[in-house]
């Protein structure tokens, strides 16, 4: 009597672990926050008299706003390039992470996603440190100013990217067999 080998074989598939799923959610949140930060009109505000974004600088003169492009200043272009570069890398990492869910062998995608996210974090931290240093150095406002929600969104995106990178760095061999 012949026995069927198909009933005895152990089929082993790579299961999506909760940490990698949370990592993917972190990457998605970072991407959303980056989009909000780049499009935000409020990076620096000053008593309803002045506001600065990554794209334009506006001053209130009498009862109307006068706006100029910020893409004429080297440090503002550098900040924008660093943030957009980081956002592009986060987008690629998100797509690779999303694709890795659909393919059978996910482990080979963990390291590239983590490396991309760490690279994005480095770019964004450089841009977010450069921005206030050069702003304070070059812009002289006689009134109280504060860094606003657009700048905060960019920091939030950086923190979520870092969290996603840490989650994708965790060694899957140590815990994947339990899921």
From Swiss-Prot:
It is found in: Membrane; Cell junction, Adherens junction. Keywords: Cell junction, Membrane, Transmembrane, Transmembrane helix. Signal peptide: none annotated. GO terms for cellular component: adherens junction; cell-cell junction; membrane. One of its GO terms (biological process) is cell-cell adhesion. It is a multi-pass membrane protein. The chain crosses the membrane at residues 21-41, 81-101, 113-133, 150-170. It comes from the Eukaryota. Regulates cell junction organization in epithelial cells. May play a role in the transition from adherens junction to tight junction assembly. Belongs to the TMEM47 family. This is Transmembrane protein 47. It comes from Xenopus laevis (African clawed frog).
């Amino acid at each position: 009597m012949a026995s069927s080998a198909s009933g005895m074989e152990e089929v082993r598939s790579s299961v999506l672990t909760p940490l990698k799923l949370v990592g993917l959610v972190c990457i998605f949140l970072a991407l959303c926050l980056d989009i909000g930060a780049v499009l935000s009109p409020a990076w620096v505000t000053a008593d309803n008299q002045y506001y600065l974004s990554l794209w334009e600088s506006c001053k209130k003169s009498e009862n109307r706003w006068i706006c100029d492009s910020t893409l004429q200043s080297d440090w503002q272009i550098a900040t924008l390039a660093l943030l957009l570069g980081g956002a592009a890398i986060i987008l690629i990492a998100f797509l690779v992470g999303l694709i890795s869910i659909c393919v059978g062998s996910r482990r080979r995608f963990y390291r590239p996603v983590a490396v991309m996210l760490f690279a994005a974090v480095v770019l964004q931290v450089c841009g977010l440190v450069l921005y206030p240093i050069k702003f304070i150095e070059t812009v002289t406002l006689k009134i109280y100013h504060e860094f606003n929600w657009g700048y905060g969104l960019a920091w939030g995106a950086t923190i979520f990217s870092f969290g996603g990178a840490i989650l994708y760095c965790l060694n899957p061999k140590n815990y994947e067999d339990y899921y």
